[in-house]
Amino acid sequence: MIQMQSQLNVADNSGAKRVQCIKVLGGSHRRYARIGDIIKVAVKEASPRGKVKKGDVHTAVVVRTKKGVRRTDGSAIRFDENAAVMLNANLQPIGTRIFGPVTRELRNEKFMKIVSLAPEVL
């Protein structure tokens, strides 16, 4: 569960290393974001020659959470970190590579580009 002020790692090669959630999109009083939800983020740490700079505000999709996701068959998948993938204005990934596993729930959310770039889909 990601909320305002949550710090997330970045799971792509857009140049950002660490971001902070500044808004959970989808409703005026929505508090938490789960895997597959879109959030607004501020870049807190970035690599020198990346596509994004420190202080930039971007859209991102949550791909891994410590809280995890519960499936209809009763199984649950949790991760060791909270991670997001940076998106542009058209909700397409900024980076060209995705690092680490992503879940099948992203396939339902129309993020097939992220699913196809990911090295592992759980």
Swiss-Prot record:
Name its GO BP terms in alphabetical order. translation
Coiled-coil ranges (or none): none
Q: Which SMART domains does this UniProt record tie to the protein?
A: Ribosomal_L14 (SM01374)
Sorted alphabetically, the Gene Ontology cellular component annotations on this record are:
cytosolic large ribosomal subunit
Keyword presence, tRNA-binding = no
Which keywords has UniProt assigned to this entry?
Ribonucleoprotein, Ribosomal protein, RNA-binding, rRNA-binding
Q: Does the keyword Ribosomal protein apply?
A: yes
Organism domain of life:
Bacteria
> A Gene Ontology molecular-function term?
large ribosomal subunit rRNA binding
> What is stated as this protein's family in its record?
Belongs to the universal ribosomal protein uL14 family.
Instruction: State how it assembles.
Output: Part of the 50S ribosomal subunit. Forms a cluster with proteins L3 and L19. In the 70S ribosome, L14 and L19 interact and together make contacts with the 16S rRNA in bridges B5 and B8.
Function (record text): Binds to 23S rRNA. Forms part of two intersubunit bridges in the 70S ribosome.
> What PANTHER family does UniProt report for this protein, alphabetically?
50S/60S RIBOSOMAL PROTEIN L14/L23, LARGE RIBOSOMAL SUBUNIT PROTEIN UL14M
Protein name (Swiss-Prot/TrEMBL): Large ribosomal subunit protein uL14
Organism of provenance? Colwellia psychrerythraea (strain 34H / ATCC BAA-681) (Vibrio psychroerythus)
